[in-house]
């Protein structure tokens, strides 16, 4: 039980730090669609798609690595709660168009990036 817990903790710590750094560096550039939040959600989609495809292709790999990457890294890095707060903030400010654009960009983009992750693994390996 300790190895899976450590895997999630290590991945989660790395993911949280990545998310924080990107938010600090990028989100002020464009407050209507904060690029740091968008980037972590899109990259997280790509990583989780590629990881699941990789582990399906190579099932003999220690499952703790999958936990580290999917539950830990992607769980710590991606952020539905911050995305939700940003959309609500846009709605409260009357920026309805940007709220809709944000929802469509995050959801559609993340789904497409997850598909791309699966596709990349099948293409390259």
Swiss-Prot record:
Keywords: Cell inner membrane, Cell membrane, Ion channel, Ion transport, Membrane, Metal-binding, Sodium, Transmembrane, Transmembrane helix, Transport. It is found in: Cell inner membrane. This is Fluoride-specific ion channel FluC. It holds the Pfam family CRCB. The keyword tRNA processing does not apply. GO terms for cellular component: plasma membrane. The chain crosses the membrane at residues 4-24, 36-56, 68-88, 100-120. The gene is fluC. Na(+) is not transported, but it plays an essential structural role and its presence is essential for fluoride channel function. It comes from Erwinia tasmaniensis (strain DSM 17950 / CFBP 7177 / CIP 109463 / NCPPB 4357 / Et1/99). It is a multi-pass membrane protein.
């Amino acid at each position: 039980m300790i190895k899976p817990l450590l895997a999630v903790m290590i991945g989660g710590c790395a993911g949280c730090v990545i998310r924080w750094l990107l938010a600090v560096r990028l989100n002020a550039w464009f407050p209507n669609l904060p690029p740091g939040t968008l980037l972590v959600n899109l990259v997280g989609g790509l990583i989780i798609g590629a990881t699941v495809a990789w582990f399906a292709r190579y099932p003999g790999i220690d499952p703790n690595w999958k936990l580290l990457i999917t539950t830990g890294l992607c769980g710590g890095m991606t952020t539905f709660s911050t995305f939700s707060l940003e959309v609500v903030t846009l709605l409260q400010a009357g920026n309805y168009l940007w709220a809709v654009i944000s929802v469509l960009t995050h959801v559609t983009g993340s789904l497409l990036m997850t598909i791309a992750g699966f596709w990349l693994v099948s293409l390259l390996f």
